From Swiss-Prot:
Disulfide bridge map: none
Family: Belongs to the peptidase M17 family.
Lineage: Bacteria, Pseudomonadati, Pseudomonadota, Gammaproteobacteria, Pasteurellales
Enzyme class name: hydrolase
GO molecular function, one term: manganese ion binding
EC number: 3.4.11.23
Protein name listed in UniProt: Putative peptidase B
Amino acid sequence: MQITLSNTLANDAWGKNAILSFDSNKAMIHLKNNGKTDRTLVQQAARKLRGQGIKEVELVGEKWDLEFCWAFYQGFYTAKQDYAIEFPHLDDEPQDELLARIECGDFVRGIINEPAQSLTPVKLVERAAEFILNQADIYNEKSAVSFKIISGEELEQQGYHGIWTVGKGSANLPAMLQLDFNPTQDSNAPVLACLVGKGITFDSGGYSIKPSDGMSTMRTDMGGAALLTGALGFAIARGLNQRVKLYLCCAENLVSNNAFKLGDIITYKNGVSAEVLNTDAEGRLVLADGLIEADNQNPGFIIDCATLTGAAKSAVGNDYHSVLSMDDELVKNLFQSAQAENEPFWRLPFEDFHRSQINSSFADIANIGSVPVGAGASTATAFLSYFVKNYKQNWLHIDCSATYRKSGSDLWSVGATGIGVQTLANLMLSRSLK
């Protein structure tokens, strides 16, 4: 079916304020002559077309630009990927941008949607490294990428006790990816950014076990790792020329005779001890290892990204990623990038007093809040702050609840969204110019 864009109103026969009308083998999307609104209308129209069972379309006419093509792709995408879009010819620069967005978006959405039976922690880090290597090979040089994978008991032996503790209960070994994208080829080059992603490939909740309904989508608990990998790959496609390091902290959180238990205490490389009071608050336990490693690189800034708390999702739903940081300038830069890329982020509070709300009688801190009515997203961030020495500057925590939708909407199908890839790539590139 051919799809065209029009600035005229649809005939009343198609309904009041209809955004779609049909003529023979053609569909027409009716715009409102408002940039952001029109992009939304195009995405909504794409969802409607997929909902009608249409799988193959051709976008025709002169009005299709980069942003309209991208909006249509986002709405037309489904997890089964049983569709085909023939895009119009664009000029070289927007054409390359569109293809890079689709390439990185497909990677992120595809890997988040993948079942845990095939995407184990080791497979996740291998796939992430392969993707970045491929991006570097296309847009820079393959030799710009070096990496190592630490898995199984090696994690414990090398002091990555958070990842090891969470993942030791599964037959699928926990793993950590340490990847260095260094286009300068200079081993002494400064690090622009360190990216730290949570990669829990399945989260049963452990002994603090989730109900079935809450567990049904927990193959997606590696959304933070996928998002940061996609963002780095997209930044490379856009010409990133400074050094960035990627740390993915990956495990399965299962119940077994080897699984960690409530009351266990983890002592991290930086000397901080943490008592486990809820095994379903495991994401912060694995991220701590990555943050310590990232902080030791003395980067320009650190971003960690995780599907971390139900509290953030309760606050902003699946429609926004939550941002928590004490660095107002870095937050400002992030929101400038988000606005430029038309992606939704929302700031939640993080203050020093939150750090006193995770007390433990047996360790330095606990992995859940210790006050009767706590701000769950904020106290989770407070936990992470104990693993960043100068936590008030150059560190962003993103609780990425918009990575996945359990139910569809008028904009998105069920499954992963890819929201955030462009914003985080934009932030890296804009900060690299300063």
